[in-house]
Amino acid sequence: MEKQYRVLLYYQYVPIEDPETFTAEHLAFCKELGLLGRILISSEGINGTVSGTIEQTDKYMEALKEDPRFASMPIKIDEADGHAFKKMHVRHRNELVNLSLEDDVNPLELTGKHLSPVEFYEQMQSPDTVVIDARNDYEFDVGHFRGAVRPDIETFRELPEWIRDNKEILEGKKILTYCTGGVRCEKFSGWLKREGFEDVSQLDGGIVTYGKDPEVQGKLWDGQCYVFDTRLTVPVNQTEHVVVGKDFFTGEPCERYVNCANPACNRKMIATEESEHKYMRSCSHECRTSERNLYVKQHNLSEEEVQERLAVIEQEQAISQG
């Protein structure tokens, strides 16, 4: 039976005049349709993901296609059981993705070669190729292409500095890069070319498109794909499922993401339900004892109950440390 909701993912680098006005108008339109999601608009284009019913998303896609700026924009469609977002945000930004460059890259003028899923699959098996994950560390940790390089970064804007510090792994190689939907690689691959790397290619349509391709069927992808909505992760490889994620607390195989219960921290952690409850969904002692701890509030734990759990954790840590 066909699911009644969809999640759309899309981007287009295209000049947008008066992006502030367009942002306000687009927010009103999305709310009128009843969509939920997050959309960024800048003078360089649009980058969005929204959820809604089949009827709502059909109307939205029709409206986008009627706008000459977005008529050729590919839209990735996932079936869903319900909304994947809690609110509808359309925000104006100076740039669609932030590399924090003094001299920004325009993907319409400079970007890496686009490879289809089949081409990417074949190329990444070549010994003279290096595959760079253009996403953040927590995205990589729950799933990635087999053999891909994991930049030690928490945000996209840290990537250029990391590349400069580790350029020896790229020199003399054919470079492949990938991200969730493709929007980050458009700019990142262009930056790589400007830095002097000659053979630079990107996965057209990103991981999401790769996982839906009928020929490659997500092969050579291990784990799940992190997504920025309430689903948190989605499957990619249709032929085998290799778990690469590890529980933050125990190191055991796991693919379940939670956020640290201390809102001042909000760290993304992979954790089983057992670990979540045992450690009060908190990444550290400081977060567990924070006055703002949401886990404590959500489960109505008394001070005595909190202290009991802290004592158990402390005792186990003392034993493990010998």
UniProtKB/Swiss-Prot annotation:
A Gene Ontology biological process term: tRNA modification
Annotated ranges, domain Rhodanese: 125-219
Listed Pfam families: Rhodanese, Rhodanese_C, UPF0176_N
Keywords: Oxidoreductase, tRNA processing
Active-site feature positions: C179 (cysteine persulfide intermediate)
GO terms, molecular function: oxidoreductase activity, acting on paired donors, with incorporation or reduction of molecular oxygen
Enzyme class at the top of the EC tree: oxidoreductase
EC number: 1.14.-.-
Catalyzed reactions: uridine(34) in tRNA + AH2 + O2 = 5-hydroxyuridine(34) in tRNA + A + H2O
InterPro entries xrefs: Rhodanese-like_dom, Rhodanese-like_dom_sf, Rhodanese_C, TrhO, TRHO_N
Protein family per UniProt: Belongs to the TrhO family.
NCBIfam families, alphabetized: PRK00142.1-3
Protein name: tRNA uridine(34) hydroxylase
Source species of the chain: Bacillus pumilus (strain SAFR-032)
This protein's encoding gene: trhO
